[in-house]
Amino acid sequence: MNPFKMQQMLSQAKEMQEQMQEKLAATVVEASSGGGAVSVKMNGKKELLKLTIDPAAVLSLSGANPDVEMLEDLITAAINEAGRRAEEILKSSMQGLLGGLNLPPGLF
């Protein structure tokens, strides 16, 4: 392969990667658990942007038997669901970006 052509392809790949990172950073997914008691926003890079806990869920922690574990589970579930949604967006974007390259299935 022509070295100039190879350099040009590498430059294009780097530019595409930068564009993808910008797109992922700008993409926001939301997820909630416990009927909306806990909600999260995460970007496509799987960075947690916001965690919201309904005050009623916090009030349930007062009293003789606070259910801290339940609130922890709701937070974990919401974060994990947002992560799954962000992963779906990442896979979809990568497939669109690399669709014409005939790469082996399951690589991305």
Curated annotation (Swiss-Prot):
The keyword DNA-binding applies. It is found in: Cytoplasm, Nucleoid. One of its GO terms (cellular component) is bacterial nucleoid. One of its GO terms (molecular function) is DNA binding. Its main location: cytoplasm. Keywords: Cytoplasm, DNA-binding. InterPro entries: YbaB-like_sf, YbaB/EbfC. Homodimer. Binds to DNA and alters its conformation. May be involved in regulation of gene expression, nucleoid organization and DNA protection. Belongs to the YbaB/EbfC family. This is Nucleoid-associated protein ACP_0492. It comes from Acidobacterium capsulatum (strain ATCC 51196 / DSM 11244 / BCRC 80197 / JCM 7670 / NBRC 15755 / NCIMB 13165 / 161). The lineage of its organism: Bacteria, Pseudomonadati, Acidobacteriota, Terriglobia, Terriglobales.
